[in-house]
């Protein structure tokens, strides 16, 4: 009877150790997610603050920044973002920019780059609102924008941030 009791104690201890290891792995992954979300939300916040004070930024873009800001803490936004990036691209129809956006890109390329970085940071922050859907959303974004120069440059910078965090 004492051998069975000792075996039961050993099995219980092993199960407790395995459960603690699994919990630790989850907690570490969630802590990494929160660090990344804090980084990208900070980047977005700094960029948005600069853009809000710039009179050259079109009003529709400011409204987009406000919408992104609302989604920063919404885990459902991560799932919705995943759905957007996994939808097949429809029939190619011409993309047209508003005249004020064209003028902005032509006359103020540095501002256009700041806008792109801020929007990218906002999207990245949203992808870190949920551990599981965030990984899927980032993967879908990478597949969708593979090879596009500016997005690739920003993604490399994002990868460097992830590496420096570990």
Predicted regions and their residues:
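Short alpha-helical interface elements
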Residues: 69, 73, 90-93, 144, ...
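Membrane-interface module
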Residues: 69-70, 82-83, 162-166
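Generic detector of well-ordered alpha-helical segments enriched in charged/polar residues
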Residues: 41, 45, 62-66, 82, ...
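N-terminal signal-anchor transmembrane alpha helix of single-pass membrane proteins
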Residues: 1-42
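Short, charged early-sequence alpha-helical segments and their helix-coil boundaries
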Residues: 76-92
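Cytosol-/stroma-facing membrane-proximal "stalk/adaptor" domains immediately downstream
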Residues: 95-166
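Acidic, Ser/Thr-rich low-complexity segments on the non-lumenal side of membrane proteins
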Residues: 46-81
């Amino acid at each position: 009877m004492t051998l069975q009791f000792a075996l039961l104690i050993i099995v219980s201890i092993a199960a407790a150790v395995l459960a603690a290891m699994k919990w630790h792995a989850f907690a570490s992954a969630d802590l990494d997610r929160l660090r990344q979300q804090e980084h990208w939300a900070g980047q977005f916040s700094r960029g948005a603050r600069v853009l809000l004070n710039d009179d050259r930024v079109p009003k529709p873009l400011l409204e987009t920044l406000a919408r992104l800001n609302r989604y920063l803490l919404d885990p459902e936004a991560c799932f919705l973002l995943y759905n957007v990036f996994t939808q097949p691209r429809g029939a190619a129809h011409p993309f047209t920019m508003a005249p004020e956006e064209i003028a902005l890109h032509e006359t103020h390329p540095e501002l256009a780059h700041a806008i792109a970085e801020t929007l990218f940071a906002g999207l990245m922050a949203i992808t870190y609102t949920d551990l599981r859907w965030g990984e899927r959303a980032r993967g879908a974004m990478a597949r969708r924008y593979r090879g596009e120069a500016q997005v690739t440059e920003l993604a490399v910078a994002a990868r460097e941030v992830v590496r420096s965090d570990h």
